[in-house]
C-alpha cells in the first residue's frame, strides 16, 4: 500500500462516520449515475486498463475467475468506516477483546482493534490468527478467551463457542450466514440490519441491480472501475421496515466454502494460492477438488503450462500446508450451475 497521510485518513473517516449516521435515514441510490455504463463481467474487469491506485485488491471470489482492482483512497476510507459502522450496529464494546481469524495472517496480539484512537480512544486487545486447522483455532480461542470473534461463517460453524467463557458474539463476511456482505473488488456491499437481522442494507457508496436471473450487478461511487459489474452472486432485493432508506438485500444465494480435510481428520479453510494464478500462470479460471485425503485435483482453464506446472503445484502445496498429491487437469469450461471453486469429496 502507498504511504498514507494518517491525519487526512483519520479526518476523512470521522467525517464519513458522521455522514453515515444521518444518511442511513435519507439516502436514495442515484441510478442516473449508471445510465452511460455498460454491464461488464469478470473477464471484462480483468481486461480493463487501470491506473496504479493506493493499493491492489486481488480475488477469485466464488467463481474461480481471478481478478484484481486498483483501489482509491476513498475506497479505503469507506472500508474503515463501514467496518466501524458494523461494530456500532452490532453494539460491540470496543473496550473488550476481539479475536480475528484472517486469511494469510500470523499469530499476533495487538493493543487496540485497529480503529483510529481519535475515533475510539480506549480499545481492548485484538488477537489475530490465520486460517489454521479447526482444532488449532479452537485451542487458540480458548486460550485467548475473547469477547468477540471475527470469523468466516464456514469456519464458525466448525467451532464450539460454548468453551469460550467471555464469548458474547461473532460476525463474519464472504459467505451465506455472514453479518456483512463484501468482496475484495467491491469492498463492503451490505451490512446486516441492526433491527431486522434477516436482511442486509446496501452501503451508500454502492448501487445494486439484478439481471433477469437475479445475478447481482454492482456499482460503486468510490472506484472508477466497478461500474455495473456483474459480480456472479445471485441475490434477492427486498424491503425493510426499520426506517432506513438504504437498498435492502433479502437473500444471497450460494457462497458457502467447503473445508479441506487433513490426514488426521481435522479440517481447514482451503487456501491454495489462487490470487497468483492469473498473473503468474495465466489461469483464467480454476476449480479445486479434494478427491480423497491424499489427492487434490486442480482443474484449470489455461494454455498448457509446461514446466511451470511444477511451480504451480509447489504454490498450492505451500498454501494448503498439507502433504497432498496435487494433480493438474486442463478443461475447456465449467458449467455455471452451482459452481463452487473448492469441493471436498471426503466424507
Model region roles, listed by residue range:
Residues 69, 77-81, 108, 199-200, ...:
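Alpha-helix boundary/interfacial micro-motifs
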Residues 1-58, 63-97, 104, 148, ...:
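Nucleotide 5′-phosphate-binding alpha/beta core
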Residues 71-72, 102, 153, 181:
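Glycine-rich, histidine-containing beta strand-loop boundary motifs that form or position
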Residues 2-14, 121-347:
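Active-site glycine/GP-rich loop and adjacent strand/helix microenvironment
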Residues 66, 106-108, 223-225:
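Short, acidic Gly/Pro/Ser/Thr-rich loop/turn segments
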Residues 84-118, 124-128:
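Conserved AMP-binding loop of ANL adenylate-forming enzymes
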Residues 51-58, 101-108, 250-259:
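Short low-complexity stretches enriched in small and charged residues
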Amino acid at each position: 500500500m502507498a504511504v498514507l497521510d494518517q491525519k487526512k485518513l483519520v479526518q476523512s473517516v470521522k467525517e464519513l462516520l458522521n455522514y453515515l449516521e444521518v444518511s442511513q435515514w435519507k439516502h436514495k441510490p442515484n441510478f442516473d449515475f449508471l445510465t452511460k455504463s455498460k454491464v461488464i463481467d469478470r473477464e471484462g474487469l480483468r481486461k480493463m486498463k487501470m491506473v496504479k491506485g493506493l493499493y491492489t485488491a486481488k480475488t477469485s471470489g466464488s467463481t474461480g475467475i481471478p481478478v484484481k482492482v486498483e483501489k482509491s483512497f476513498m475506497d479505503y476510507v469507506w472500508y474503515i468506516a463501514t467496518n466501524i459502522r458494523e461494530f456500532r450496529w452490532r453494539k460491540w464494546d470496543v473496550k473488550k477483546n476481539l479475536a480475528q481469524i484472517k486469511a494469510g495472517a500470523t499469530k499476533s496480539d495487538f493493543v487496540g482493534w485497529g480503529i483510529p484512537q481519535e475515533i475510539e480512544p480506549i480499545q481492548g486487545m485484538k488477537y489475530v490468527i490465520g486460517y489454521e486447522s479447526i482444532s488449532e483455532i479452537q485451542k487458540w480461542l480458548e486460550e485467548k478467551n475473547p469477547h468477540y470473534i471475527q470469523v468466516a461463517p464456514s469456519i464458525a460453524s466448525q467451532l464450539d463457542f460454548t468453551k469460550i467463557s467471555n464469548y458474547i458474539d461473532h460476525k463474519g463476511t464472504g459467505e451465506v450466514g455472514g453479518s456483512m456482505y463484501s468482496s475484495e473488488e467491491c469492498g463492503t456491499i451490505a451490512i446486516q440490519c441492526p433491527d431486522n437481522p434477516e436482511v442486509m442494507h446496501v452501503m451508500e457508496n454502492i448501487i445494486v441491480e439484478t439481471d433477469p436471473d437475479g445475478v447481482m450487478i454492482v456499482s460503486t461511487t468510490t472506484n472508477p472501475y466497478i461500474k455495473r459489474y456483474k459480480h456472479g452472486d445471485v441475490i434477492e432485493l427486498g424491503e425493510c421496515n426499520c426506517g432506513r432508506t438504504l437498498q435492502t438485500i433479502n437473500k444471497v444465494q450460494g457462497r458457502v466454502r467447503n473445508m479441506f480435510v487433513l490426514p488426521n481428520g481435522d479440517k481447514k479453510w482451503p487456501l491454495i494460492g489462487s490470487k497468483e494464478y492469473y498473473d503468474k500462470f495465466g489461469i483464467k479460471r480454476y476449480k479445486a477438488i479434494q478427491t480423497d485425503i491424499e489427492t487434490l485435483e486442480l482443474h484449470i482453464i489455461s494454455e498448457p503450462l509446461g514446466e511451470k506446472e511444477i511451480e504451480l503445484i509447489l504454490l498450492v502445496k505451500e498454501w494448503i500446508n498439507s502433504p497432498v498429491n496435487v494433480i493438474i487437469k486442463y478443461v475447456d469450461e465449467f458449467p455455471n450451475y452451482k459452481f463452487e471453486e473448492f469441493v471436498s469429496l471426503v466424507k
